[in-house]
């Protein structure tokens, strides 16, 4: 979960325009209200030529993906009979999935869920940054709206770290976030996971309907885990021996 610096997307848009290149954005995870606007690119007022959507588009009840394009791109691909069959799909147009997508978009707009994600995301981030001040193992808190990453750093310090020449912390880089996630699930019934491209980062992506009380519950659960200051071995044992 890396938030690009302000102005990054605008510069990308300028570069693609300068070189007459299409700008294609993948908003499968960031789109549909997750970051506090309907689409993440709206934070910088950028309009892509093509946008990829999925996951939340189905409202959690139907698998649905979509490739959305500007009229100019659409006309280029499908604007005449000679072009209409150049781009096809062997599986698409599911009526029930599309109906779920339409209802999902309607609910996002009617219930102001992007704005809700913006406000509750700020509340969540502030709570996590307060935790960070108390626990050095939290290296960084970052995110936008309700797309949040919690990166960990050196859960072991002092003599043990020196005796192992830092090896135990190298081990922790691969497993600490998953151990924290395991504690959250086993002890507090909170489902989360580490990120695939950095196993030392835990993703926090609650539903856009999450409440402040539920966010507080997660913050208190993390406080409980960090305050116990368990070693890696104890944490691993508590995760694998936890009875369902």
Residue spans of the language-model regions?
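Conserved N-terminal phosphate-binding loop of PLP-dependent enzymes in the Aspartate aminotransferase
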Residues: 1-244
